Swiss-Prot record:
<keyword id="KW-1003">Cell membrane</keyword>
<feature type="transmembrane region" description="Helical">
    <location>
        <begin position="95"/>
        <end position="115"/>
    </location>
</feature>
<keyword id="KW-0997">Cell inner membrane</keyword>
<keyword id="KW-1133">Transmembrane helix</keyword>
<dbReference type="InterPro" id="IPR005538">
    <property type="entry name" value="LrgA/CidA"/>
</dbReference>
<dbReference type="GO" id="GO:0005886">
    <property type="term" value="C:plasma membrane"/>
</dbReference>
<keyword id="KW-0812">Transmembrane</keyword>
<comment type="similarity">
    <text>Belongs to the UPF0299 family.</text>
</comment>
<keyword id="KW-0472">Membrane</keyword>
<dbReference type="Pfam" id="PF03788">
    <property type="entry name" value="LrgA"/>
</dbReference>
<feature type="transmembrane region" description="Helical">
    <location>
        <begin position="65"/>
        <end position="85"/>
    </location>
</feature>
<feature type="transmembrane region" description="Helical">
    <location>
        <begin position="6"/>
        <end position="26"/>
    </location>
</feature>
<dbReference type="InterPro" id="IPR022957">
    <property type="entry name" value="Uncharacterised_UPF0299"/>
</dbReference>
<feature type="transmembrane region" description="Helical">
    <location>
        <begin position="34"/>
        <end position="54"/>
    </location>
</feature>
<protein>
    <recommendedName>
        <fullName>UPF0299 membrane protein plu1549</fullName>
    </recommendedName>
</protein>
Length: 145
């Protein structure tokens, strides 16, 4: 790999992380101005989504940074898991309600996803197809009899 290629790849990662970080900073700034409590990271994610959805910025600008973060997502959850252990006493007292709510919410999500997937992927008639025309002709013949 030549020095030029290293610089190009480095620039692509730098541009992606700067873009993601600018969206985060903008989201934090907007969050501090709002009268309701919405995390700045959520607002920043929505800003990044809008920028990409309306193609205000090309998707390949954010792709290198996003793919790197997604590859290492499990590693990024490690500090959160360690931080939760600071509240071990409180968690151990409430373990049954926590496990129960996790199981119920997981079941609800699975049911909703199943019905949504079934609805989205159902078989739809093709408008103007020969089978549709034949069905309409058969209905008309039955009505005439």
């Amino acid at each position: 790999m030549s020095f030029r290629e290293v610089l190009i790849v480095g620039w692509q990662y730098l541009r992606a992380f700067v873009l993601i970080y600018l969206c985060l900073l903008t989201g934090n700034a907007i969050s501090s101005l709002l009268p309701i409590i919405i995390p700045g990271s959520i607002i920043g994610m929505l800003i990044l989504f809008v920028l990409l959805a309306f193609q205000l910025i090309p998707a390949h600008w954010a792709k290198p940074g996003c793919s790197l973060l997604l590859k290492n997502m499990t590693l990024l959850f490690l500090p959160i898991g360690v931080g939760v252990m600071n509240y071990y006493d409180q968690l151990s007292q409430q373990i049954i309600p926590i496990v129960f709510s996790c199981l119920i919410s997981t079941a609800i999500v699975m049911i909703i996803v199943a019905y949504s997937s079934h609805y989205v992927h159902r078989e739809r008639p093709i408008v103007g197809s020969t089978s549709e025309i034949n069905n309409e002709q058969q209905k008309q013949e039955k009505q005439e009899k």
